[in-house]
C-alpha cells in the first residue's frame, strides 16, 4: 500500500514515494524513471511495497546508504552529476582504462565500450556511459596512476602507479580522489559492464562488498562484458600481457572493482570459482588463495583444480615429482602457481598492480604466518603452537615429524582424550607421535597424487598409514615442510596463496624439501622409528599403566607376545587387526624400512599404491568409502561429488592429497586442508561450509570407509578426529583386510611392530590404546559403568571395521598371547578396556555422530568394515567389496585354520572369537560392564569368572571375527565357531549355515528344551552345561518335554547340511568348549552362532548351562560363561548386551529366573543393535538362515512341546538355533511360532537376519539389557529404524543407540521389544523382550502398554494389534505357566505376535520374551499393565508354544501357529508371516 501510495504520491513519473530509487536518479542526475517505470507496474503486492522492493532490489546498493557504502558501483547510480566534476576525472580515468584496454587489449576495451554501451543502452545513463566510455578512451591516458598523480603510462604508468599505489585509490580513497577517483570508481562501477544495464543487484562496490557484489551483475551486459573481459584479460594474462590485463584492469580503476567483479562474476559463473578480485577485502575463505581472477579463463576454469593443485597439488606435484622425479613436480607445481600468480597479478582487477598485490600478499603472507591468516582471518585450522605441540613443532622443523606426530597421534589423542583422560594423556604423547603419523598422512596428502589412486587415500588407513612412514616419511618431511609453510599458503591459497613471497617460500621449501628429502627420508625413517618407538613407548607406557592396572605384563606380552601370535592370528583371524595394526605397523616398521620404503615408495609408490589400491579398492578407497556413505549423502551431493570427481580426476590426485590432507590434517591441520577445502569450495562465494564436512570432492570410488565425518574438519566435527582415524583403520582394517591377504605379511610384520600403534586409529587407536594401553581400563571401568550402555555401542559402532578391530585385534592378540592363564585378567582388562573403549568410543562416536546417521556411519565404518566386513558388512556395499569373496574366503579359511588351531586354545576365547570383534569387545565390554556395572549382581563376578574365558576369546575374537569363529569353534561355541566361521566367512550366507548349525546346536541344546535336551544332544558339552543349568533345566525339562528333546536332538542334527555340519561342529565345539570351565558350550543355540554369523557372538553362554546356552546366542557379545547357569545367564545377560539382544531367549525358564537377576546387566543397545544389525545383514546375506531355521526350525517346530521359544529357537535356529525356547523374543523367524510361541522370533534373528527389519529381538535382548534399563533402551530403537534400511547401519547405526535408549527410556523398564519401530518393516513379533529382562524391574513396563509400545508401530506396517496386540509377556505367560511355562511363555509370546500385517512375518508376534526372564512371572506382573494382550492371548501362547513349534516356520504361516494363535488373540495366524517380508522367509520354510 505504502509503496503504491508512495509512488502515487511521488507521481506517475515512476518515482516511488520511496526516495531510494528516486534518490539514485537525483544523485545520478538521471531519471531512473524508465527503469522504475518498468518496475512501477503495480500489482496487488506492490501496495505491500513489493514493487518498490523489486525496484530497490535490482540494485541493493541503490539505497542511499548503500550508495555511500558502495560508492559508484551501481552503474545506474551516478552519484555525482555528469557535469564532469567528479565524473570527468573518472571518465578520463576510464578512458585511460579503455584506451589502455584498447591499446593493450583492444578486444577488451572495445568489448567494454560495447558492453558499456549495451549497458548504457540498457541503462538510462547509456549516453553518459557511452560518453564516459568515449571520454574514457580519449581520457584513456588518465589512469589510476594519474589519479594517484603518477604518470599514466597506460600499462606502465597504470601498472607503475598501481605498484606505487599499494592500494587502490578506490579502496583507499583520498579526499582528492574522493571527488574524482572515488566518484570515478563509482561511476565506472556504475558504468561497469559487469553491472548490467539496470540497477545493479549487486553490491555497489566490489571492494566494499567482498567483490560479491562487485562480481558481474547477472545481466547480459555484464555477462558479455565479463566474458569479453575475461577473454581479453585472460588472454592478456595468458598471453603474458598481464601488464596489459593489469593495466587495462588497473586503468579501469573504477571498473576494476567492477571488472574484478565482472571477471570474478563471469569467471566465477563460468568456472564456478572466481577468487574475489579484492581478495584483500574478502575474507580469506572468500578469496581464492590466488586472486585467480587474473588467471586465464582457461586456467580459471580449471582453477578449482589448480587451486587444489596449487595448495595440495604443488606439494603434491612437488612430492609426486619428489617421489618420482623429486623436482619435476615441484617445478611444475611452481610454474602453475607462478603462472597463476602472474596471471592473477596481471589481470588482477584490483587497482593495485600485481606487484602491489604481491606486496600486500607478502604482507598477508607475513600475516598468514600467524594463525590469524592473511586477512587476519583466523585460520582455525592453523595448528596453533601449544606446549604439547612444541615437540611437534620441533618435529615440524623436521617437517614430517611435526605432521607425522601430529596427525595420527593427535587423531588418536583426540579419540583417546574422548575415550579417556588416561588416553588423553597418552594422546598427548601420541599427539606428538601422531604428529609424525599425521605428518606422514599429511605428506601422504601430497603423496596421494604421486600415488594417483585415491585408493592410496583409502588405503590410507593401511596404505597411507604405512606409507606415511614410507612415502609419508619422504613426504612427511616435505609435507611437514610444505605444510609448515603451506598452511599459510593454504590460507593464502584461500587469499593470495599465489603471492610471490609465498611462492618463493614454497619454492624454497620445495627445493629444501627436495634436498632434505633424501636426508629426510633417512631422517624420516629414523624419525618414524623414533616416532613409532615413541608411540610404542607411549602406548607401552600407557599400556603398562593400563596393564599394570590389570596386567602390566599383558601389554608388553600382548604387544610383543600377541604380535607373534597375532601375526598368524592377525593374518588369519584378524584381517582387520592387521589392517588396524598395519598402518601403525607401517609407521613403526616403516621407520626401519622408511629410508628404503620411502625411496622405493617414491619409485614403488605406484606399486605400493597398487597393492594398497587393491586393498583399498577392496577396502574401499575414500571415494568408495564415501560411496558407501554416499548413500547417506543426499543424491545431489553424491552427484556433485561424482561430477567433481569426474571434473577433477586430476584433482582426485590432488584430492587424494586433498583428502589426505583433509583426512590427516583433519586432525592436526584440519584447517589447512579445511582451508584448502574452503578455498576450493569457499572460493566460490556460494560455498557452503557444510561441504567442508564432506571431502571436497568425494570420490565415489573411495569407499566411505572414512566416514564423511572424517572429511569433516575435526574442528567442524569432533568425529573428524576420531572418525577419520576410524576410517583410517577401516581403510587400513578394511583395506588391509583385503590387504591382509595382499599385504598381510608386511602388515603383519608391521602389525607386530606396530601392534600397539594400531591405536593410531582414532576409534581404533583409542580402542587399541584402551585395549593395549590399559590405563584406560581403569578410567574405562568407570566409563564402563557409566558408558556400559554405550560401551558396546561405541564398540559396536566402531568395533566393526575400526574400533572393534583395533581393540579387538589387541584383545585378540592379548588373548592369543595370553589366552590361557592370563585370560581372565586379560579378559577383565580387555573387558574393562573394551567397555570403556566402547563407552568412550561410542560416546565419541555419538558425539561425533549423535545422529543415527553418524552412528550408522560409525557402525558401517566400524561395524560394517569390521564386523560386517567379514560377515554382514560384506553385505555392506562399501565393504562387500572390501571383503571380496576372495577375501571372505581367505578370511574364512583363516578363520577355520584359526578355528582348528584355536579350538583348543581358544576355547575360552573361542566364544569371543566367534563374536565379531566389536561383539567380542561388546562381550568384553559387557562382561566388564557387568563386572564394573553389575558387580553388585552375581552377574558381574560370574561374568568375569565365566566371561573371562569367553572374553579372552573375544580378544582373539577379532581374529575369530576375522577367522570366522575359529576360537568360537573351539569353545562350546566350537560348534558355533565353525558354523559361525562359515557364517562369518559367508558373512551371512554362512550365517544361515551357522544358524543352521547353531540351529542344530541350539536345537540340540536349547531347542525345544532350551538347554534341557542339549544334554542328550550336546552330550558332554551339554551335559556339562547341563550340570550348570541342569537344575534350571530341570524346570525346563519338564516344560521342554523329553519328547521334544528327542525331537530337538534329531532336529538339531537335522538342521540341514550346514546345520548338521555345524551341529556336529557345535557339538564338537560345545563338547570341547563346554569342557572349558565357563566355556560357552551353550552356543549350542544356533542363535548364538546365528548371532555370531552376523555378530558372531559366543553362545550367549549366560553362564547358563550350555542348554541355557540357547540364550547364549543372543549375547553375541556374551562371553558365554557357562559356570553358574543363572549366574552365568545373569552375567551373560548383564554383561552381554548381545545376549540380551538375542536373549529374549534367555531361557526364560530357570535361567531367565536367574536372569531376572541378570536384568541389571544393561547391554549397550549398540551391542544388541550391532548383533541385530549383524544378524540382519547375515539374514539378508544368507537366505539360508531360514534354511537353518528350516532344519533347526523344523526340528524346533517339530518339537512344539519344547518351549515354543526353544522350538521356535530351533526354527529360529536359523539364528543359530538360538533356540529361543527361552528366546520367545520376537524371533525374527516369523513363522516358527507365528502364534509367537515357538516363534519367539527371537529378534536375535533380527540380528541374524540383519536385513530383516524385525530386529525387535534386540529389544528382547534389551529385556535383559533393560534390566539395565537405560542401557537396554538403546536396543529397542534399533527396532524403530527399518532394520532393512538399518541393516547396514545396524540398529546402532541407523538409530543412535542413545536414541534407541531414549526411545526406550520412556519404555525403559520394559524397553518393550514390542516397540518395533514401524520402520522395522518386517519386525515380526515385536517381542517385548521386556519379558526377558522383564524381570521385576522391567516386568513393570513403565506405564507403557503393549499397545503403546506397539502403537509407535501402529503407524508402522504391522498394525498394533488392538488390545489384542497381546504383547504377551512371556512373563505373563511365564507367570501363568511359571518359569516352566517359559515354553508356554514362548507360546504366549505369540500372543504378543501382533498382527504385523506388514511386517515380514506379518504377524510375527511381538513375542515378549519376557518369559525368558519372566520365569517367575515377576515381569509378568510388571508386564501386566503392559499386558495389553488379553490374558486369553496368553493362554493361546502356550498352545502356540507347543503347536506353533510344529509350525516349523512353514512359510511362517500361522497355519500351524493359527491353531495356537487363536487364543493368542494376536491373530498372528491370520497374518501368516509374509515369507517375503521375512528376510528369507522362503529360506525359513523347512
From Swiss-Prot:
In-chain residues carrying the UniProt-annotated modification Phosphothreonine: 228, 753
Start-end of Polar residues biased regions: 88-137, 219-235, 288-300, 960-986, 1181-1191, 1457-1474
Coiled coil: 494-544, 880-904
Residue list for modification Phosphoserine: 166, 168, 222, 226, 387, 415, 479, 555, 621, 762, 793, 1070, 1159
First and last residue of the signal peptide: none
Pfam families tied to this protein: BAT2_N (PF07001)
Chain intervals for the UniProt region annotation (Disordered): 1-20, 39-306, 320-341, 385-519, 531-658, 792-847, 893-918, 950-1080, 1177-1205, 1410-1443, 1455-1486
Cross-link Glycyl lysine isopeptide (Lys-Gly) (interchain with G-Cter in SUMO2), where in sequence: 251, 751
Membrane-spanning intervals of the chain: none
Keywords: Coiled coil, Isopeptide bond, Phosphoprotein, Ubl conjugation
GO biological process, one term: in utero embryonic development
Biased composition (Low complexity): 600-611, 638-656, 998-1007, 1410-1421
Basic and acidic residues biased stretches: 422-433, 478-488, 501-519, 1025-1055, 1062-1074
Coiled coil keyword on record: yes
Protein name: Protein PRRC2B
Protein source organism: Mus musculus (Mouse)
Lineage: Eukaryota, Metazoa, Chordata, Craniata, Vertebrata
Amino acid at each position: 500500500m505504502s509503496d503504491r501510495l508512495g509512488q502515487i504520491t511521488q507521481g506517475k513519473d515512476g518515482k516511488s514515494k520511496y526516495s531510494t530509487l528516486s534518490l539514485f536518479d537525483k544523485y545520478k542526475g538521471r531519471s531512473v524513471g524508465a527503469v522504475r517505470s518498468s518496475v512501477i507496474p503495480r500489482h496487488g503486492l506492490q501496495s505491500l511495497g513489493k514493487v518498490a522492493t523489486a525496484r530497490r532490489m535490482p540494485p541493493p546498493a541503490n539505497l542511499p546508504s548503500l550508495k555511500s557504502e558502495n560508492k559508484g558501483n551501481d552503474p545506474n547510480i551516478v552519484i555525482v552529476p555528469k557535469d564532469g566534476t567528479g565524473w570527468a576525472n573518472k571518465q578520463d580515468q576510464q578512458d585511460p582504462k579503455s584506451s589502455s584496454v584498447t591499446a593493450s587489449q583492444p578486444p577488451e576495451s572495445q568489448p567494454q565500450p560495447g558492453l558499456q554501451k549495451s549497458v548504457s543502452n540498457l541503462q538510462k545513463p547509456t549516453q553518459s556511459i557511452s560518453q564516459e566510455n568515449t571520454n574514457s578512451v580519449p581520457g584513456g591516458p588518465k589512469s589510476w596512476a594519474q589519479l594517484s598523480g603518477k604518470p599514466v603510462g597506460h600499462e606502465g604508468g597504470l601498472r607503475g602507479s598501481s605498484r606505487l599505489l599499494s592500494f587502490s585509490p578506490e579502496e583507499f580513497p583520498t579526499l582528492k580522489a574522493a571527488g574524482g577517483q572515488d566518484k570515478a570508481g563509482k561511476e565506472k562501477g556504475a558504468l561497469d559492464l559487469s553491472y548490467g544495464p539496470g540497477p545493479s543487484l549487486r553490491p555497489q562496490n566490489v571492494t566494499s562488498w567482498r567483490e560479491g557484489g562487485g562480481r558481474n551483475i547477472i545481466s547480459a551486459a555484464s555477462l558479455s562484458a565479463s566474458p569479453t573481459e575475461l577473454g581479453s584479460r585472460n588472454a592478456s594474462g595468458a598471453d603474458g600481457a598481464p601488464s596489459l590485463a593489469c593495466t587495462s584492469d588497473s586503468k579501469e580503476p573504477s571498473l576494476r572493482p567492477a571488472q574484478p567483479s565482472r571477471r570474478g562474476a563471469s569467471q566465477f559463473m563460468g568456472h564456478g570459482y572466481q577468487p574475489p578480485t579484492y581478495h584483500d577485502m574478502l575474507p580469506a575463505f572468500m578469496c581464492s588463495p590466488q586472486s585467480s581472477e587474473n588467471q586465464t579463463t582457461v586456467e580459471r576454469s580449471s582453477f578449482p583444480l589448480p587451486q587444489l593443485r596449487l595448495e595440495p597439488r604443488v606439494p603434491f606435484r612437488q612430492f609426486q615429482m619428489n617421489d618420482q622425479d623429486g623436482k619435476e613436480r615441484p617445478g611444475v607445481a611452481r610454474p602453475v602457481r607462478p603462472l597463476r600468480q602472474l596471471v592473477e597479478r596481471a589481470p588482477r582487477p584490483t587497482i593495485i598492480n600485481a606487484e602491489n598485490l604481491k606486496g600486500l600478499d607478502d604482507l598477508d603472507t607475513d600475516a598468514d604466518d600467524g594463525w590469524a591468516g592473511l586477512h587476519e582471518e583466523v585460520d582455525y585450522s592453523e595448528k596453533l603452537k601449544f606446549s604439547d605441540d612444541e615437540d611437534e613443532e620441533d618435529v615440524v622443523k623436521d617437517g614430517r615429524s611435526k605432521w607425522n606426530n601430529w596427525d595420527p597421534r593427535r587423531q588418536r589423542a583426540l579419540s583417546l582424550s574422548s575415550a579417556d583422560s588416561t588416553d588423553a594423556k597418552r594422546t598427548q604423547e601420541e599427539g606428538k607421535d601422531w604428529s609424525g603419523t599425521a605428518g606422514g598422512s599429511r605428506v601422504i596428502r601430497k603423496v596421494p597424487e604421486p600415488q594417483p589412486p585415491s585408493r592410496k587415500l583409502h588405503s590410507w588407513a593401511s596404505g597411507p598409514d604405512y606409507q606415511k612412514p614410507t612415502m609419508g616419511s619422504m613426504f612427511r618431511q616435505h609435507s611437514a615442510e610444505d605444510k609448515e609453510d603451506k598452511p599459510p599458503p593454504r590460507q593464502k591459497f584461500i587469499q593470495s596463496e599465489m603471492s610471490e613471497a609465498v611462492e618463493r617460500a614454497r619454492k624454497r621449501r620445495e627445493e629444501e624439501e627436495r634436498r632434505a628429502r633424501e636426508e629426510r627420508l633417512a631422517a624420516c625413517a629414523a624419525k618414524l622409528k623414533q616416532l613409532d618407538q615413541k608411540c610404542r613407548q607411549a602406548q607401552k607406557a600407557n599400556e603398562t599403566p593400563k596393564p599394570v592396572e590389570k596386567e602390566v605384563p599383558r601389554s608388553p606380552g600382548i604387544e610383543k607376545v600377541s604380535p607373534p601370535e597375532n601375526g598368524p592370528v592377525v593374518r588369519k583371524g584378524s584381517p582387520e587387526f592387521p589392517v588396524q595394526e598395519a598402518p601403525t605397523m607401517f609407521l613403526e616398521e616403516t621407520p626401519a624400512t622408511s629410508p628404503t620404503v620411502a625411496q622405493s615408495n617414491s619409485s614403488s609408490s605406484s606399486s605400493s599404491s597398487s597393492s594398497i589400491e587393491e586393498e583399498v579398492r577392496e577396502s574401499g578407497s575414500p571415494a568408495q568409502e564415501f560411496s558407501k556413505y554416499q548413500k547417506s549423502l543426499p543424491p545431489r551431493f553424491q552427484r556433485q561429488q561424482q561430477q567433481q570427481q569426474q571434473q577433477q580426476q586430476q584433482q582426485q590426485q590432488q584430492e587424494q592429497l586433498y583428502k589426505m590432507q583433509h583426512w590427516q590434517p583433519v586432525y592436526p591441520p584440519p584447517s589447512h586442508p579445511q582451508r584448502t577445502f574452503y578455498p576450493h569450495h569457499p572460493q566460490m562465494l556460494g560455498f557452503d561450509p557444510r561441504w567442508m564436512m564432506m571431502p571436497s570432492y568425494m570420490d565415489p570410488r573411495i569407499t566411505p570407509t572414512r566416514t564423511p565425518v572424517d572429511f569433516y574438519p575435526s574442528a567442524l566435527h569432533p568425529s573428524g578426529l576420531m572418525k577419520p582415524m576410524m576410517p583410517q583403520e577401516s581403510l587400513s582394517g578394511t583395506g588391509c583386510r583385503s590387504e591382509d591377504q595382499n599385504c598381510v605379511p608386511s602388515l603383519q610384520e608391521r602389525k607386530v611392530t606396530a601392534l600397539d600403534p594400531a591405536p593410531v586409529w582414532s576409534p581404533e587407536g583409542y580402542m587399541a590404546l584402551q585395549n593395549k594401553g590399559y590405563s584406560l581400563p581403569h578410567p574405562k571401568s568407570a566409563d564402563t559403568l557409566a558408558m556400559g550402555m554405550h560401551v558396546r555401542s561405541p564398540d559396536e559402532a566402531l568395533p566393526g571395521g575400526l574400533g572393534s578391530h583395533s581393540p579387538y585385534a589387541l584383545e585378540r592378540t592379548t588373548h592369543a598371547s595370553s589366552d590361557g592363564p592370563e585370560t581372565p585378567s586379560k579378559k577383565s582388562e580387555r573387558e574393562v578396556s573394551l567397555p570403556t573403549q566402547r563407552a568412550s568410543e561410542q560416546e565419541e562416536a555419538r558425539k561425533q555422530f549423535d545422529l543415527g546417521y553418524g552412528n550408522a556411519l560409525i557402525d558401517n565404518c566400524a561395524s560394517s568394515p569390521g564386523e560386517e566386513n567379514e560377515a554382514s558388512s560384506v553385505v555392506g556395499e562399501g565393504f562387500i567389496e572390501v571383503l571380496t569373496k576372495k577375501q571372505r574366503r581367505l578370511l574364512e579359511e583363516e578363520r577355520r585354520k584359526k578355528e582348528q588351531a584355536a579350538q583348543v586354545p581358544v576355547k575360552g576365547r573361542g566364544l569371543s572369537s566367534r563374536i565379531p570383534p566389536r561383539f567380542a569387545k561388546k562381550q568384553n565390554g559387557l562382561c566388564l560392564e557387568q563386572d564394573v556395572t553389575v558387580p553388585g549382581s552375581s552377574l558381574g563376578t560370574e561374568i568375569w569368572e565365566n566371561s573371562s574365558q569367553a572374553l579372552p576369546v573375544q580378544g582373539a575374537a577379532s581374529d575369530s571375527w576375522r577367522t570366522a569363529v575359529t576360537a568360537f569353534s573351539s569353545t562350546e561355541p566350537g560348534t558355533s565357531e565353525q558354523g559361525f566361521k562359515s557364517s562369518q566367512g559367508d558373512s551371512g550366507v554362512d550365517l544361515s549355515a551357522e544358524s543352521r548349525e547353531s540351529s542344530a546346536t541350539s536345537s540340540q541344546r536349547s531347542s525345544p528344551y532350551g538347554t534341557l535336551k542339549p544334554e542328550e544332544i550336546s552330550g558332554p558339552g551339554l551335559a556339562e552345561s547341563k550340570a550348570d543349568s541342569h537344575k534350571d533345566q530341570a524346570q525346563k525339562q519338564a516344560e521342554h518335554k523329553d519328547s521334544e528333546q528327542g525331537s530337538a536332538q534329531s532336529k538339531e542334527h537335522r538342521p540341514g547340511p550346514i546345520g548338521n555340519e555345524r551341529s556336529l561342529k557345535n557339538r564338537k565345539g560345545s563338547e570341547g568348549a563346554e569342557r572349558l570351565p565357563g566355556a560357552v558350550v551353550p552356543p549350542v543355540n544356533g542363535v548364538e552362532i546365528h548371532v555370531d554369523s552376523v555378530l558372531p557372538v559366543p553362545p550367549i553362554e549366560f553362564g547358563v548351562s550350555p542348554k541355557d546356552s540357547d540364550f547364549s546366542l543372543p549375547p553375541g557379545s556374551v562371553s558365554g560363561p557357562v559356570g553358574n547357569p543363572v549366574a552365568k545367564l545373569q552375567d551373560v545377560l548383564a554383561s552381554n548386551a548381545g545376549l540380551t539382544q538375542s536373549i529374549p531367549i534367555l531361557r526364560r525358564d530357570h535361567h531367565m529366573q536367574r536372569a531376572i537377576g541378570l536384568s541389571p546387566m544393561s547391554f549397550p543397545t549398540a551391542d544388541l543393535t550391532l548383533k541385530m544389525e549383524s544378524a540382519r545383514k547375515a539374514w539378508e546375506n544368507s537366505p539360508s538362515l531360514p534354511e537353518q531355521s528350516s532344519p533347526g526350525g523344523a526340528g524346533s517346530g517339530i518339537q512344539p512341546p519344547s518351549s515354543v521359544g526353544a522350538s521356535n529357537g530351533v526354527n529360529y535356529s536359523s539364528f543359530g538355533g538360538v533356540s529361543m525356547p527361552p528366546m520367545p523374543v520376537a524371533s525374527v523367524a516369523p513363522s516358527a511360532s507365528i502364534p509367537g510361541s515357538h516363534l519367539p522370533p527371537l529378534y536375535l534373528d533380527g540380528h541374524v537376519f540383519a536385513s530383516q527389519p524385525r530386529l525387535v529381538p534386540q529389544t528382547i535382548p534389551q529385556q535383559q539389557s533393560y534390566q539395565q534399563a537405560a542401557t537396554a533402551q538403546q536396543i529397542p530403537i534399533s527396532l524403530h529404524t527399518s532394520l532393512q534400511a538399518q541393516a547396514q547401519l545396524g540398529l546402532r547405526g541407523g538409530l543412535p543407540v542413545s536414541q534407541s535408549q531414549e526411545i526406550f527410556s520412556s519404555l525403559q523398564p520394559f524397553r518393550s521389544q514390542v516397540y518395533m519401530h514401524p520402520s522395522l518393516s518386517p519386525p515380526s513379533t515385536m517381542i517385548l523382550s521386556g519379558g526377558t529382562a522383564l524381570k521385576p524391574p522391567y516386568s513393570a513396563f513403565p506405564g507403557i502398554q503393549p499397545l503403546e509400545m506397539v502403537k509407535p508401530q501402529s503407524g508402522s506396517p504391522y498394525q498394533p494389534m488392538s488390545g489384542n496386540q497381546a504383547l504377551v509377556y512371556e512373563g505373563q505367560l511365564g507367570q501363568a505357566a511359571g518359569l516352566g511355562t517359559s515354553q508356554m511363555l514362548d507360546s504366549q509370546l505369540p500372543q504378543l505376535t501382533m498382527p504385523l500385517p506388514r511386517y515380514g512375518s506379518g504377524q510375527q508376534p511381538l513375542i515378549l520374551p519376557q518369559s525368558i526372564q519372566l520365569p517367575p512371572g515377576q515381569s509378568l506382573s510388571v508386564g501386566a499393565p503392559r499386558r495389553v494382550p488379553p490374558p486369553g492371548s496368553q493362554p493361546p501362547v502356550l498352545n502356540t508354544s507347543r503347536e506353533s513349534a510344529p509350525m516349523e516356520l512353514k512359510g511362517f504361516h500361522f497355519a500351524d501357529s493359527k491353531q495356537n494363535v487363536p487364543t493368542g488373540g494376536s491373530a498372528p495366524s491370520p497374518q501368516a508371516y509374509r515369507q517375503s517380508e521375512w528376510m528369507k522367509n522362503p529360506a525359513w520354510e523347512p
